[in-house]
Amino acid sequence: MQNQNPVELIEYELTTFIRRAVYLDQSEKRTGNLERSSYLLLRQLDEFGPARVKELAESFKLDISTLSRQAAALEAKELIYRFSDPSDGRVSLFTITKLGKQLLKADQQKRLERYEQMLKEWSTQEKEMFGELLQRMNKAFID
C-alpha cells in the first residue's frame, strides 16, 4: 500500500481496526466481563451522570428502542437504576449503581492493562497524539 492516498490508508486501517476490535470483543480473548454496549453505557453514566433514555440514545446514535433494551438488561442486573426526573416526573432518568461502578472499574482496569500491553513500545508522545487523533475522528463521525 505504498504511495497510497492518505484517506484510502485511513479507511483501510480503520476498517481493519474495527474488525479486529469486534473480534476481540466477541472472542474468548475478550477483555473484562461486560459486553461492549454495557461497558459504554455504564461509562457514559459514570462520567456524565444521570441521563434520559433519549439522551443516551442520541449520544450513541442508537434507536431509543435499542437503548431501552440495553438499559433494561443493565437494570435487571442492578447495574443501573431508574428514577423519576425531579424536574418532570413523567420522564425517567438512569444512573449507575454502586455495583455498576464496581464492575465498570474492574472492566476498565482490565481494558487499560490490555491497551498498555499493546502500546508498550509507543512513546508517551505517540500515545498522546494517537489519542488526540482518535478523539478528532470520533467527533468527525457525529458532526
Curated annotation (Swiss-Prot):
Residues in the signal sequence: none
DNA-binding span(s): 53-76
Keywords, in A-Z order: DNA-binding, Transcription, Transcription regulation
GO BP annotations, alphabetical order: regulation of DNA-templated transcription; response to stress
SMART domains in alphabetical order: HTH_MARR
Occurrences of domain HTH marR-type (ranges): 11-139
A Pfam cross-reference name: MarR
Protein name: Uncharacterized HTH-type transcriptional regulator YxaD
